[in-house]
Amino acid sequence: MPRGLELLIAQTILQGFDAQYGRFLEVTSGAQQRFEQADWHAVQQAMKNRIHLYDHHVGLVVEQLRCITNGQSTDAEFLLRVKEHYTRLLPDYPRFEIAESFFNSVYCRLFDHRSLTPERLFIFSSQPERRFRTIPRPLAKDFYPEHGWEALLMRVLSDLPLRLPWQNKSRDINYIIRHLTETLGPENLSESHLQVANELFYRNKAAWLVGKLITPSGTLPFLLPIHQTDDGELFIDTCLTTTAEASIVFGFARSYFMVYAPLPAALVEWLREILPGKTTAELYMAIGCQKHAKTESYREYLVYLQGCNEQFIEAPGIRGMVMLVFTLPGFDRVFKVIKDRFAPQKEMSAAHVRACYQLVKEHDRVGRMADTQEFENFVLEKRHISPALMELLLQEAAEKITDLGEQIVIRHLYIERRMVPLNIWLEQVEGQQLRDAIEEYGNAIRQLAAANIFPGDMLFKNFGVTRHGRVVFYDYDEICYMTEVNFRDIPPPRYPEDELASEPWYSVSPGDVFPEEFRHWLCADPRIGPLFEEMHADLFRTDYWRALQNRIREGHVEDVYAYRRRQRFSVLYGEMLF
């Protein structure tokens, strides 16, 4: 390979990343217009388009590099020099951290995810830690209550770029002050002030004002979800001021925010104070930089692995028929490998399973489906694998494993946030906790269905409970669109013997679902059945599901709230907003 090409290749990769992130910002910048026009279908399409941008631009760069090198193979020394030149381009580059991830992606595409070593890739960042901690320009504006909180909030809302009229701005300001007074007390509130992000965070049908409530005793989140009425008038639906509430809003089971972030590292650093429980990977994920979030997630895994003496074990819960799931006992992720062969009742292919996971990645997850990171040729040290798990891997997924002596390589896997399986949770709780879990499960089903997602397999074992007590779906192999399902009533038996027969007396076609049957497995436990009948009996009715289908087919997009209904101002303070 001719010398001098290394710099050209490094520059080509960085220019390719520039093009990708420019398009990323372009799609993101359209969020305000989509919100103001209430074009919710365009919101959903923009979310999918933005996710696809990264892989598309990686592919373009790979083709450019093949042209530059005339398709010639490259030796290890040449690749090391390319990385060296690329590293020299980064000190003055504002999005250096994501540019490193883009380099990794191009390398993996060129070499089929092989030879993934720290010498060839940016396994850890090449840049000093201070670059992540320095915010080069203000990302937020401070507001002080010199003339009281009513005047302060009027300035905050008047500063917003939204061009729609307010339904009743004074009412909303009074609601916020009332909430803050109840939360902090009048004296603390008078000594507090706000710091508000310059950019709004758009997601679904809301524009979120994200800020920090700086009080004498510490800094709290300050989150205002701004919605619009059917008449196109703005209103604030609630005010959230706890880290737990903020964590749910920025949760791993939600779609990525559209927030204009030319300096993503700076925004992540600014958010860290109000989201102390979130990892760096989760913060990048929340603002839509999902590929760099994957890099950070892998780094978090490596750091944990270096500091622990644990071995991977099979994850707790009922063993899956499609996925083999394992974990490190102290690490909050699970690793999911598609089995070589599925249980007989699972009539599907591995390609179908991967397509289902991609559907979830691109769809609105409404806070009820866990996000995943997909890895290829994932290397594990054998010393980190328990003998029982190694035996299970070779038994269930041998075709996806390459033995390298002291290591194994798993050809393909997913990494996902670990939760307590709902079936285990229900065995361990009682009283109000049990009631809350059943309410959450039913709400998860409803919200998924309203977002045009039918889980397929609704057994409790396919759902998990987060640290905030939310129920989240995580088994995607039978997932499909609501509009693809044929919901049917079970026909009455022709003869008394029909009900005793081992086979149904009626025909069943692919896609047929009988909601009456849900009762058999969801209400079998006498502790759970009465609660389910009380709160979610309509899930057993065909007309409920068909009505949802009709709304979806008519183009209706449901509101999605990242907080409880009882937290809405209309419920707290009594006035219906629309």
From Swiss-Prot:
Cystines in this chain:
none
- One MF term in the entry's GO annotations: protein serine/threonine kinase activity
Swiss-Prot/TrEMBL catalytic activity: L-seryl-[isocitrate dehydrogenase] + ATP = O-phospho-L-seryl-[isocitrate dehydrogenase] + ADP + H(+)
Q: Where in the cell is it found?
A: Cytoplasm
Give the GO terms filed under biological process for this record: glucose metabolic process; glyoxylate cycle; tricarboxylic acid cycle
Which amino acids does the record list as binding ATP?
Answer: A315, P316, G317, I318, R319, G320, M321, K336
The answer to whether keyword Nucleotide-binding applies is yes
Q: What does this protein do?
A: Bifunctional enzyme which can phosphorylate or dephosphorylate isocitrate dehydrogenase (IDH) on a specific serine residue. This is a regulatory mechanism which enables bacteria to bypass the Krebs cycle via the glyoxylate shunt in response to the source of carbon. When bacteria are grown on glucose, IDH is fully active and unphosphorylated, but when grown on acetate or ethanol, the activity of IDH declines drastically concomitant with its phosphorylation.
- The protein's name: Isocitrate dehydrogenase kinase/phosphatase
The main place the protein resides is cytoplasm
Name the source's superkingdom: Bacteria
Active-site positions on this chain: D371
Kindly give the Pfam families that the UniProt entry links to this protein. AceK_kinase (PF06315), AceK_regulatory (PF20423)
Q: Which NCBIfam families match?
A: PRK02946.1
Please state which protein family the record places this protein in.
Belongs to the AceK family.
Q: Does the keyword Flavoprotein apply?
A: no
> What does UniProt give as GO cellular component?
cytoplasm
The EC number(s) attached to this protein equal 2.7.11.5, 3.1.3.-
Q: Could you tell me which InterPro entries the record lists for this protein?
A: AceK_kinase, AceK_regulatory, Isocitrate_DH_AceK
- Which keywords does the record carry? ATP-binding, Cytoplasm, Glyoxylate bypass, Hydrolase, Kinase, Nucleotide-binding, Protein phosphatase, Serine/threonine-protein kinase, Transferase, Tricarboxylic acid cycle
